Amino acid sequence: MAILGLGTDIVEIARIEVVIERSGERLARRILTDAEWAHYQQHQQPVRFLAKRFAVKEAAAKAFGTGIRNGLAFNQFEVFNDELGKPCLRFFAKAAELAEQMGVRHVHVTLADERRYACATVIIES
């Protein structure tokens, strides 16, 4: 295994809250997959949930070395938890194609939040 990419991101949770207050659920709908949207709607702290997902997806795009552009979109990355609660990442559409082209076989995700910030790191390996 070799590290193909590493990305990290930090998000000010209040910034996400302001966007939600201003534009309703448009940001969440743009960022989240259908499965994530279902969790978001049921979550006791939806702003924190969205901030953490945003951070993971930004970190993943950075790990790919592309950022969110050229057909890559936030909702092509899906954050889910394994049976032990560990965060994991699935790829769809252009993100899945890029992962295949790069030879991605393993993805490591960590995320955290504290009062004001959410942060995430993503490592992709061959």
From Swiss-Prot:
Cofactor(s) annotated in UniProt: Mg(2+)
Binding site for Mg(2+): D9, E58
EC number of this enzyme: 2.7.8.7
Transmembrane intervals: none
Reaction it catalyzes: apo-[ACP] + CoA = holo-[ACP] + adenosine 3',5'-bisphosphate + H(+)
Molecular-function GO term, any one: magnesium ion binding
InterPro entries in the record: 4-PPantetheinyl_Trfase_dom, 4-PPantetheinyl_Trfase_dom_sf, ACPS, Ppantetheine-prot_Trfase_dom
Pfam families, A to Z: ACPS (PF01648)
Keywords of this entry: Cytoplasm, Fatty acid biosynthesis, Fatty acid metabolism, Lipid biosynthesis, Lipid metabolism, Magnesium, Metal-binding, Transferase
GO terms for biological process, alphabetical: fatty acid biosynthetic process
Annotated localization: Cytoplasm
GO CC terms: cytoplasm
Its job: Transfers the 4'-phosphopantetheine moiety from coenzyme A to a Ser of acyl-carrier-protein.
Family from the record: Belongs to the P-Pant transferase superfamily. AcpS family.
NCBIfam families recorded: acpS, pantethn_trn
HAMAP family reported for this sequence: AcpS
Protein name, as recorded: Holo-[acyl-carrier-protein] synthase
Species per Swiss-Prot/TrEMBL record: Pectobacterium atrosepticum (strain SCRI 1043 / ATCC BAA-672)
Gene: acpS
